[in-house]
Each structure stands twice: as structure tokens, then as C-alpha cells.
């Protein structure tokens, strides 16, 4: 196992370190898919306000690549489609009817595909999980038919007050291993699983790479710099460990999993801890009664959340 050590970086001494134990967060009344989360997105709407959707219903697609869809994270009704300047898509907000409804079964939907590689790519595209990948350079969603020189899985997080990646992965180790195995089918190159110093994470048939030091030791760009730097003629992809867990669960169960673990932390947090919530959950619902002063909050970033502002 290769080991890399960074001596310089960011190490901010912030009070309010979260308890590394996972608690259930408040259930959201609304959820959303946020347009600004996706660099270079040119959306084409596939639903209208007032329309009923289930988990996995395509809400919009990429105009240049219609195979890339962005799906509803729950069963509900489209409450609003919000646009900004020059009609840029800001958000699609869903009124939640059910968080327990499984939605579309992708294994059944594509069960007649004989090629495993084609099956994996099709399921990732149709479930919306394709947008979990980012290309380097440019940090954009990869085109549907592209193949990277290598794939980097970031199985660590060195941002201040972030969740412990090993804790979250070990809670669903089978799903993580399944996700790695499926993602590896998307490239002829190597899959780099990058983890923290002294992490016990191992995945059968795959190498892990250990990184030590302050932030940005946990960033994909740092890992690429040491292991397989991208350039103008070579594209590599990156993906986070919670997205790998979701991919693993997709192929183990057939259904899209939108659960994510976030860190509620900082000096104003009443009870700094890890919360289990959902992709696109409303912060208004999630953070009610969590902070002493909601004018200044900090949330770690392993998930896309509905952005809000407080007066």
C-alpha cells in the first residue's frame, strides 16, 4: 500500500467537533434538486409544477446529453421550478409525500441487458447517479459514452469537523465493495481508493492509497497530483465515498438510495453530531432547533442540500 504525507495545509481549530455517532435527522417536508450543483449544466425540463413524481422520476436532463437525467429524490409533487437570471435553473422543489417509497426498480428495468458494462452504465445514467462523477480537468459531469483513464474514489474527508469516513463506510461495507466493483467497469485503467492514515478499509482485488496530513490531504485533486495527474489529453474521474455507497445499494437492491450522513457542528451547534438525512433535504426542516444562532451555520459537504438563508 502506497503512503503519502502532506506537511502543509489547512487545520482550523474550530470548537464544536461532532460526536462520531450517527443519529436520525428530522424528516424533511420538502426536498430539492439544485441546478448550481452541476457545473456546465444545460437543463431541459421533463416535468411541470404540480406533477406527481416517485423516487427516480427524471425531473430534467442535460440538453447536450439527454441520457444524463436528474431525478426526484422522493415520492411527492413538484411544488416549484425556480429560475434565476437568464432563466438559469436554480432548483426543482418537491413536496414530500413518502420517504419510504422505493420508487423505480432499475434492476428489473434493465434486466434484459446482457453486457454487464452496458448494464452498469445504463443504470447509473437512468438513476441519476451518473452525475456523482466529476471529470478532471474541468470538474464537469462526464459525457455518457466517455471512458476515463482512471477513477479516484475519495474514501476520506479532511475538512474541519467532517464525518469519519471509515465509520460511515463500515456501516455499509458490502455496499461500498459492490459500488467499487461496479464503478471499476467504467474504465480500463486503475481505480484508486484513497483513504486516511491508519484507516483499516480494504476492498478485495483493489489497492488502497493512504494519505496523511491536514486539508487538502483528503481532496481528489491532491490524490490525482500524486497518483495519476490529468492533463489536456488525459481525463480522470473522481467520486465520493457516499456516492459509492449509493451505487452499491443501487445494484444490491435495484433501488435508488438517497440517504446521506452529514455533520452538524461548530461552536453554535447545540449538540454537534452526525445526522442521517436525505439528498436534497430542506435545511429549514433539518436544522430547526439545532443551532443557538441560525445566522451563522456550518455543515460538512458530502451531500447536496437545499440551500437557504437566514436573516
Regions found by a protein language model. Give the residues of each.
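A generic structural signal for short beta-strands and their flanking turns/coil linkers
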Residues: 29, 72-74, 90
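Single conserved hydrophobic/aromatic residue that forms the stacking wall/gate
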Residues: 297-311
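Buried, small/hydrophobic-residue-enriched core segments of structured protein domains
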Residues: 68, 82-285, 289-296, 300
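Acidic, glycine-anchored pre-beta loop/turn
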Residues: 47-56, 82-85, 280
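Mobile cofactor-carrier "swinging-arm" domains
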Residues: 1-14, 21-22, 79, 84, ...
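N-terminal, Lys/Arg-enriched amphipathic/low-complexity engagement segments
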Residues: 1-46, 61, 211
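Hydrophobic heptad-repeat coiled-coil signature
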Residues: 53, 59, 302-304
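Generic structural motif
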Residues: 37-41, 53-56, 65-80
Amino acid at each position: 500500500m502506497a503512503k503519502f504525507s502532506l506537511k502543509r495545509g489547512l487545520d482550523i481549530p474550530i470548537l464544536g467537533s461532532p460526536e462520531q455517532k450517527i443519529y436520525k435527522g428530522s424528516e424533511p417536508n420538502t426536498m430539492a434538486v439544485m441546478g448550481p450543483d452541476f457545473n456546465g449544466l444545460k437543463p431541459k425540463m421533463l416535468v411541470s409544477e404540480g406533477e406527481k413524481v416517485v423516487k427516480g422520476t427524471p425531473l430534467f436532463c442535460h440538453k447536450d446529453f439527454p441520457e444524463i437525467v436528474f431525478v426526484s429524490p422522493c415520492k411527492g409533487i413538484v411544488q416549484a421550478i425556480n429560475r434565476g437570471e437568464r432563466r438559469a435553473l436554480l432548483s426543482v422543489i418537491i413536496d414530500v409525500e413518502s420517504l419510504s417509497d422505493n420508487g423505480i426498480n432499475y434492476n428489473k428495468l434493465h434486466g434484459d441487458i446482457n453486457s454487464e458494462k452496458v448494464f452498469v452504465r445504463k443504470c447509473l445514467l437512468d438513476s441519476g447517479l451518473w452525475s456523482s462523477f466529476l471529470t478532471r480537468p474541468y470538474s464537469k459531469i462526464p459525457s455518457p459514452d466517455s471512458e476515463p483513464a482512471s477513477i479516484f474514489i475519495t474514501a476520506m474527508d479532511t475538512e474541519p469537523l467532517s464525518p469519519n469516513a471509515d465509520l460511515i463506510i463500515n456501516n455499509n461495507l458490502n455496499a461500498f465493495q459492490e459500488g467499487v466493483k461496479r464503478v471499476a467497469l467504467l474504465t480500463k485503467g486503475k481505480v484508486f481508493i484513497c483513504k486516511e492514515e491508519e484507516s483499516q478499509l480494504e476492498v478485495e482485488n483493489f489497492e488502497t492509497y493512504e494519505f496523511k496530513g491536514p486539508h487538502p490531504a483528503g481532496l481528489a485533486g491532491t490524490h490525482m497530483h500524486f497518483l495519476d495527474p490529468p492533463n489536456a489529453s488525459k481525463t480522470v474521474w473522481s467520486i465520493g465515498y457516499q456516492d459509492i455507497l449509493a451505487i452499491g445499494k443501487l445494484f444490491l437492491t435495484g433501488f435508488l438510495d438517497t440517504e446521506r450522513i452529514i455533520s452538524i457542528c461548530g461552536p453554535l451547534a447545540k449538540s454537534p453530531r452526525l445526522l442521517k438525512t436525505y439528498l436534497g433535504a430542506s435545511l429549514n426542516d433539518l436544522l430547526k432547533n439545532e443551532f443557538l444562532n441560525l445566522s451563522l451555520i456550518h455543515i460538512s459537504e458530502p451531500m447536496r442540500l437545499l440551500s437557504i438563508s437566514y436573516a
